[in-house]
């Protein structure tokens, strides 16, 4: 399912399983967008400087762009309200 340029952190597996099928469809589309254009999301600021966030409906995807290695690491896929509580 994942493109060669996208790397998914192991911790995301549980988050993925917690999503409903319609949410997974949104995430799949969002991951394709991120793969096509990693800066499509918004850069985050302290204390998360260096990370990016992309919204897909109520889902927030947090990722890091590894420019020199030419890949993107997906660090979190969660409902936006859950992300705010972390």
What is the predicted role of each segment?
Residues 1-6, 11-28, 55-59, 64-86:
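Enriched for short, Lys/Arg-rich terminal
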Residues 29-55:
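A short, surface-exposed loop/turn module that caps and links secondary-structure elements
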């Amino acid at each position: 399912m994942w493109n060669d340029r996208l790397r998914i952190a192991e911790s995301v597996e549980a988050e993925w399983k917690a999503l409903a099928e319609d949410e997974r469809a949104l995430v799949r589309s969002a991951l394709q967008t991120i793969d096509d254009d990693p800066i499509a999301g918004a850069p985050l600021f302290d204390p998360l400087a260096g990370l990016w966030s992309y919204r897909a409906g109520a889902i927030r995807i947090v990722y890091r762009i590894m420019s020199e290695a030419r890949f993107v690491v997906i660090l979190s896929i969660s409902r936006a309200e859950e992300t705010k509580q972390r």
